[in-house]
């Protein structure tokens, strides 16, 4: 069976051109990931010559453990501000990133949207409701499995498994060139560097991705083997991908943050940013079959 036709009872379907265009793009950008079993977490002690971990203790990558996943599809690109605008416009919601710092990022076309966790979750679920497809945020396990091209023992989710500034991830100078008008930019337009072997872009660069899971420091010690979805509750959500440098860019590195980002303010109380431009996301479709474009 191939998913593709919209459900006859799709929720609140908006026939606007912008929504139709977004749905076409969202489906066309999906990469099918065949399910399988892999060793999730820091595989350094088991695979490297010196038997040392890749991930420092503050990256929560241990212990490595076996995980089995069903097949799914994941977007090759992060969601952009243009994509997110189509969603908020369709629901008559105010557009995001209009404050002093955030608005500078959205002025550059195809820049990843910086959002809070609930906004990312709601966007993916909305895509599911208007398309009839089981869209959602990826689980942490799905994200790492796809980043490592179906669980290969590669430390970085780049075209060659290495982190090479200026070649497969952006250098500081390249970020400045792509994001003129933004001081010390953290993200830049999507798809500017080669994808990983699975065909996914910006998995080791260009900000982090929110995933579905609540964060627990010790979750790996008792994670279920099949299709783990993280703890039942928590206070922080997991983010994957690069935050600051080559260490946080490791495919096994885990980051945590409160679902609602605390606004940045000036001394006089003026809010200059109510989201973090570095907090992006992409969606998955939880179907065992490929999705028709």
Question: Which residues does each PLM region occupy?
Answer:
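Extended beta-strand/loop cores of jelly-roll/beta-sandwich
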Residues: 1-141, 150, 264-293
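Functional-site microenvironments in short loops/helix caps that host divalent-cation chemistry
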Residues: 39, 106, 111, 117-263, ...
């Amino acid at each position: 069976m191939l998913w593709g036709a919209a459900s006859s009872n799709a929720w609140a379907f908006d026939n606007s051109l912008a929504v139709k265009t977004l749905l076409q793009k969202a489906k066309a950008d999906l990469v099918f990931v065949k399910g399988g079993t892999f060793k999730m977490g820091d595989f350094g002690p088991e695979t490297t010559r010196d038997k040392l971990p890749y991930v420092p203790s503050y990256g929560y990558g241990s212990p490595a453990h076996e995980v089995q996943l069903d097949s799914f599809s994941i977007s090759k690109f992060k969601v952009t501000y243009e994509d997110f605008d189509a969603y908020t416009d369709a629901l008559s919601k105010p557009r995001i990133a209009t404050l002093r710092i955030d608005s500078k990022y959205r002025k550059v076309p195809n820049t990843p949207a910086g959002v809070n966790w609930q906004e990312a979750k709601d966007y993916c679920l909305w895509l599911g409701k208007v398309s009839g497809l089981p869209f959602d945020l990826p689980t942490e396990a799905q994200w790492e499995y796809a980043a490592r091209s179906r669980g290969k023992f590669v430390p970085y989710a780049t075209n060659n498994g290495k982190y090479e500034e200026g070649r497969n991830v952006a250098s500081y100078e390249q970020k400045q060139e792509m994001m003129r008008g933004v001081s010390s930019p953290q993200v830049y337009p999507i798809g500017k560097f080669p994808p990983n072997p699975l065909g996914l872009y910006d998995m080791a660069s260009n900000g982090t991705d929110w995933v579905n899971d609540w964060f627990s420091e010790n979750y790996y010690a008792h994670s279920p083997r099949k299709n783990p979805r993280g703890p039942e509750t928590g206070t922080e959500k997991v983010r994957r991908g690069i935050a600051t440098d080559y260490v946080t860019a490791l495919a096994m590195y885990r980051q945590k943050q409160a679902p609602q980002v605390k606004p940045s303010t000036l001394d006089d109380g003026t809010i200059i940013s109510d989201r973090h431009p570095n907090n992006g996301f992409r969606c998955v479709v939880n179907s065992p079959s490929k999705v028709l474009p």
